[in-house]
Amino acid sequence: MRRKIMYNPRKYSSQVVDGFERAPSRAMLYPVGFTKEDFNKPQVGIASTWSMVTPCNMHINKLADETLKGVNATGGKAIIFNTITISDGISMGSEGMKYSLVSREVIADSIETVVGCQGFDGVVAIGGCDKNMPGCIIGLVRLNRPSIFVYGGTIQPGKNHTDVVSVFEAVGQFANHTIDAIELENIEKIAIPGPGSCGGMYTANTMASAIEALGMSLPNSSAQDAISDDKNNDCVQAGQAVLNLLNKDIKPRDIMTMKAFENAITVIIALGGSTNAVLHLIAMASAAEVNLKIDDFTRIGQKVPVIADLKPSGKYMMSELVKIGGTLPLMKMLLDAGLLHGDCLTVTGKTLAENLENVKPYADSQEIIRALDNPIKKDSHLRILRGNLATDGAVAKITGKEGLSFKGNAKCFSREEDALEAILNNQIITGDVIVIRYEGPVGGPGMREMLAPTSAVMGKGLGDKVALITDGRFSGGTHGFVVGHITPEAFEGGVLAVVKDGDEILIDAQNNVLELLVEQAIIDKRLYNWTQPKPNYTKGVLAKFAKLAKSASEGAVTD
């Protein structure tokens, strides 16, 4: 009879602290709070993204402390360490935004580095701002040690139901003389009342919801207020749950399967989530060695409706969804309709179906989540477009409010700042297709988000009159007729590089087409005469990212 091999929950820490030869390691750990008994416990690293850089993360040190309590009370030894965060909202529209996507890779690399070096047996990662979520998950799945992600939680609405996007759009209103300087200053002072991630179904809330649907967070972790007893309890429970994962040897790659990624895509479509989910889920799948492709979003999107009336395209904020029950009743609706894989394993140690078994439906009186047979849009708002402008794909977010097609004449800009200046100075008119190029992963480098120009378009009252296309990306707060992630990007010789002012462009979201309506012979001649610009950076982290980054359709990954 074969003897059953028991999993050692101290698989990694034992190599660091066990035996007489590891006395120097133990000596270093006594001053940071270890007792002799602690060396016999599984060590759990708590990766905190705390920072005073942004309100999204300013409270996460307290959440890390709560997580530590949960680990230590359940027989583990928790060690808190930090990784970085940047603020998309603060750097948006500036040269600094080029570092945003880079931060995803730095977060992943730093978590992998610390945990790999220190020999932690398990990990709990806590994130707030947009790139924290995919960065943490990429780091966790590379390590493939028992792990959980905790979302820092959503911010409360500002006064008069405002948020950060309200401020961006107010800039356009000010330029349009719709509001004055005093009104603009008032909006900037009231829009962001305290800690938590940006309040609509923007990138942070989108990715938190995706990670929960993926199975890497505890139930409803994605739908809790940043400052709340629920969020504190979520952290304590995550600390407890990671010990259960250690004892059962359940690791991220056991959870993050192709079917789990399909669940994540389904949920973010139903919620009306950010285009950034396409980029980040592909990157997360790549780290997990799951063969998720950009066209999988089209396949899944054909059968999943948009049912959440959430900002930016809708009316409500995440904190209002929290009040009616969060994301769990929505997931139960999708499961009961056969749109989710209920047999996927999650960090509870149970399947998704088991987690949702006793979830009650939303109250009939609520207006945020619609019934599946009465959707906002009958299929996905995330459209993967192809055509001569995007032979390898582009991503649009079309809810239907903008219409389903747009044909107009190009106005071309090689920097985001130039496009924004043109919008604010009334150089964009009805029927224009604003083309912002050389903003891709390599060309930017860093694939900046175009929230400043798209918000200016909205503030100017042009939201339903113009379109914007780019090889950069969009904030989750962007709405309007916009297409991003155009691949191949301009810097790599994509057709986007040779679009000229006045060229006619067709965006057809119904048939998933993005086409430059110029004869192929003319396009070929332009490409023959095109010369690649000099790189914007030749040293430093941006230059490094430009050398390593793959295309947007491949998640802009660097490994």
From Swiss-Prot:
The keyword rRNA-binding does not apply. One of its GO terms (molecular function) is dihydroxy-acid dehydratase activity. InterPro entries: DHAD_IlvD/Edd, Dihydro-acid_dehy_C, DihydroxyA_deHydtase, DiOHA_6PGluconate_deHydtase_CS, ILV_EDD_C, ILV_EDD_N, IlvD/EDD_N. Keywords: 2Fe-2S, Amino-acid biosynthesis, Branched-chain amino acid biosynthesis, Iron, Iron-sulfur, Lyase, Magnesium, Metal-binding. GO terms for biological process: isoleucine biosynthetic process; L-valine biosynthetic process. The active site is at S475 (proton acceptor). Binds 1 [2Fe-2S] cluster per subunit. This cluster acts as a Lewis acid cofactor. The gene is ilvD. It catalyses: (2R)-2,3-dihydroxy-3-methylbutanoate = 3-methyl-2-oxobutanoate + H2O; (2R,3R)-2,3-dihydroxy-3-methylpentanoate = (S)-3-methyl-2-oxopentanoate + H2O. SUPFAM superfamilies: IlvD/EDD N-terminal domain-like, LeuD/IlvD-like. [2Fe-2S] cluster binds at C56, C129, C198. Pathway: Amino-acid biosynthesis; L-isoleucine biosynthesis; L-isoleucine from 2-oxobutanoate: step 3/4; Amino-acid biosynthesis; L-valine biosynthesis; L-valine from pyruvate: step 3/4. This is Dihydroxy-acid dehydratase. Belongs to the IlvD/Edd family. Its EC number is 4.2.1.9. Disulfide bonds: none annotated. Its cofactor is [2Fe-2S] cluster; Mg(2+).
